A protein has these predicted regions:
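Conserved alpha/beta core of the MobA/IspD/sugar-nucleotide pyrophosphorylase nucleotidyltransferase superfamily
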Residues: 206-315
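Phosphate- and divalent-cation-binding pockets in alpha/beta enzyme and binding domains
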Residues: 48, 92-93, 236, 256
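Conserved N-terminal catalytic core of the sugar/cofactor nucleotidyltransferase
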Residues: 23-47, 54-133, 139-144
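Leucine-biased recognition of intrinsically disordered, low-complexity hydrophobic segments
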Residues: 5-6
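Conserved core of the sugar-phosphate nucleotidyltransferase
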Residues: 142-227, 231, 235
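Residue-level signal for inorganic ion chemistry
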Residues: 66, 122, 137, 180, ...
Length: 315
């Protein structure tokens, strides 16, 4: 096993994990941005089975969605990967990971306290390091020879700050994604300085609160399901969970990112690629079609689609 890789094991977190880091280490971690760890969240009630579904990849090989996501992560130079899962799911996820299972650490989110809590469950795993964060119910398809995760990691290393991938998204889809507003600071690399973060806004709220010059009318920069975050996010989350203890309201990652934008440089980037969300209606089908049309069997798939369209009959 290569140096730095973690054997497949399972950790359990029911309480909000403590997070402590010296000022010196915090400064050095951001200065280096040596991103070697990744966290994949897959513990949500509606999310937990989606990474286990089978797809045919661009090479025509059948594998789980999880395996495809892990390959995306590995291509970005990541050495250690944690997957946040629901209790009892480790065996299924280990099997779905196939030959990549030895790279994984499984972290059980024993209480269903939401996405932000799932991310914070990995605080001990990420420690004082910046890390790549992905959701387990998205597929990422690059339009270049460099994977989406590799693009984002390269940008984070160059910018030495937290960075979220975003995608121009029509307002009809805002109910599914967080959205950001900000100033375009690098047109060539499509980098934005984030000043506003909203959690699944309505079109009216987005129009009133988000300003992104240059986007088409009715379109907003929505999260891609992929971030590189600094250790500061865990300090912010720890404080938010402490303040929220005993209350019925939830802690959202969106709020933590908004605080992050106030305390350190935080940017967003449009990548050369697209996200495909398994969690929406026909999402898995759309992801499979995208893979097929970008792969070696494209012509065969197109012929099948033409035949299907020619013979399909609606009610």
């Amino acid at each position: 096993m290569a140096h730095g890789l973690l054997a497949a094991d399972t950790h359990h977190f029911s309480e909000v994990p403590a997070f402590d880091q010296s000022e010196e280490n915090r400064h050095n971690s951001v200065k280096r941005m040596d991103i070697r760890k990744a966290v994949i969240t897959a513990a949500g009630k509606s999310q937990r089975q989606l990474p286990l579904q089978s797809l045919v990849d661009r090479d025509g090989q059948t594998k789980s969605a999880l395996a495809i996501i892990i390959e995306e992560v590995i291509s970005a130079g990541i050495e250690s990967i944690a997957v946040v899962i629901s209790p009892g799911d480790s065996a299924a996820f280990r099997a779905a990971a196939g030959p990549h299972a030895q790279r994984l650490t499984f972290i059980e989110q024993t209480q269903p306290l939401g996405y932000a809590h799932a991310v914070h469950c990995a605080a001990e795993f990420t420690g004082g390091d910046a890390f790549l964060l992905l959701v387990g119910d998205h597929l990422y398809l690059s339009h270049t020879g460099q994977g989406c995760a590799a693009q984002l990691v390269a940008l984070a290393r160059a910018e030495k700050c937290a960075i979220s991938a975003v995608q121009s998204t029509h307002e009809s889809q805002l109910a599914y994604y967080g959205a950001v507003g900000g100033k375009l600071v690098d047109a060539i690399r499509r980098l934005y300085q984030v000043d506003t973060v909203l959690e699944k806004p309505t079109p009216t709220e987005a129009e009133q609160k988000i300003d992104v010059p240059g986007l088409r009318a009715g379109y907003y920069l929505c999260f891609f399901g992929m971030h590189v975050l600094t250790p500061a996010v865990h300090r912010v989350l720890a404080a938010m969970f402490k303040e929220n203890a005993g209350r019925e309201t939830s802690v959202h990652l969106r709020a933590a990112l908004a605080q992050l934008a106030e305390s350190e440089r935080y940017v967003a980037a449009e990548l050369d690629g697209r996200r495909y969300d398994f969690g929406v209606k026909y999402g898995l089908l759309t992801a499979q079609l995208a893979l097929a049309l970008a792969g070696k069997d494209r012509d065969e798939v197109l012929r099948g689609m033409v035949e299907l369209l020619a013979t399909a009959r609606g009610k």
